[in-house]
C-alpha cells in the first residue's frame, strides 16, 4: 500500500516532558594522553542540539507541523542555548524554571564519527516541580489536536494523570514515550511507544510474537490504552490495538550509524501524522520510515517532509503494507472506504511476473484509487497448474507484486478460486484478465449484489508464464 503523507501543516501538537541539550565536542584524535591511557581529542567543532522532549518538538516543526513545548530548565547558560536552538527552528518554549538545578545536558566527545565519552549534567526534579509544569500546560490543550508526553524519567512527568484526564475531556489524544517499570501512571493515554527493552521491563521476557501481542493486549485492557506501538530495532515495529489484528511493520533502515533520538523521531512523526488526519496504520508506517532515515544520521537529528517523500518513493513495498494478511486488509479497506477511495481487486497466480502482467495491473489500477491483488498460495497453484509449479514461492511472488507502483495490497488465498475472499472484501470493482464472461468470474455475483461492478480486461497477446517456461526449457 502506498503511504500518503497528510498535510503536516495542519498538525497542532503540544509536547511536554524532559527537555535537554545535546552538546557535541568533536575533533581529530592522533595520540594518547601522557597523563592516562586515554585518547586526546583536539576539539575543533562545538555544536548544540535540542534533545529529549525538545527534539520531539523540533522534529514536529521540521516535518511542517506546529509544535509548542513545555519543560523544566535551570537558570543557566544551557537553558539559554536550548531556548535559542528551538526558537531558531520555529518552536516557542513554555519553561518552568527551577533555581539551583542545571538544565539537563548530555555532552558527547566525538572523533572520526565515533562517540568516545558522554558526560551527563543533571539533577532529578521533584513531584512539586513536575506538578507545576503540568498545571502550567493545561491551557495549551485548547489549542492542539495531539499531546505528547516525552518521559525520560528525569522528573518532568511523575504523575501525569490530571493532565491525561484533562486532555481526554477535551478530545486531545495523548501519545506517550514511556519510561520506567510502571505504565499505570499513563492510564487513559491514547498510545504508548515503548521500545522492546522498556516493554520487557514492564511485562517480563517476551518469548514469541504471540506472547508480545498477548502481553500488550493485557496492558491495553489494564490501563485503558487505545493502542501500543512496540519498536523492536532490526525487527521493525508492532502495532497492537484493542479491536484489530496486530500489524507488524518491518524496518526500512539500511544503515545504522547512531540510534540517538530515534525514539523521539518515532513519536514526533506519529503525533504529527495523527494530528494531520492519518489513521494509525498509516501514521505508524510514516514513523517507521522516519526512524529509518534518522538512524542513518550521526547524533540527535531531525527528518524533513522531503526526506520522507524520497524515502517512501524508494522503499515502496518495504513498509509492511504491500503484502498483508486477510484481516489486516479488511481493516485497511474499511479505512479506504471511509476516505471515499474506489477499490479495485483482481487475482491470479502471477508465477513469473512479465510485461503482460505489469500492463494488466496498470490498467486495473487506473480504474480506481487502490488496487488489491489476491494471489494463489503455493498449494493452490500446484493444484491448478500441476507438478513443477509454482516456479516462485508465494512469498517471492507477493514481494515482487508489492513492489509495483500500481499495486497497493497483496493478499494470499488458499482455495482454488478467490470467491470466498472476494465475498468478504467486496471491492468497488472486480477485474479479471482474459476472455471470461462477467457472469463466470468468481466472486462477481457477490460484488454486483453489493452494488459493485465487474469488468473484463484484455491481456497482451503472445505473453504468458507457460510460454516463458516452455521457451526457457527449449533453450536449455
UniProtKB/Swiss-Prot annotation:
One of its GO terms (molecular function) is heptose 7-phosphate kinase activity. It is an enzyme of class 2 (transferase). ATP binds at residues 195-198. Residues 345-476 are annotated as: Cytidylyltransferase. It catalyses: D-glycero-beta-D-manno-heptose 7-phosphate + ATP = D-glycero-beta-D-manno-heptose 1,7-bisphosphate + ADP + H(+); D-glycero-beta-D-manno-heptose 1-phosphate + ATP + H(+) = ADP-D-glycero-beta-D-manno-heptose + diphosphate. One of its GO terms (biological process) is ADP-L-glycero-beta-D-manno-heptose biosynthetic process. Residues 1-319 are annotated as: Ribokinase. One of its GO terms (cellular component) is cytosol. Catalyzes the ADP transfer from ATP to D-glycero-beta-D-manno-heptose 1-phosphate, yielding ADP-D-glycero-beta-D-manno-heptose. Homodimer. HAMAP family: HldE. In the N-terminal section; belongs to the carbohydrate kinase PfkB family. In the C-terminal section; belongs to the cytidylyltransferase family. This is Bifunctional protein HldE.
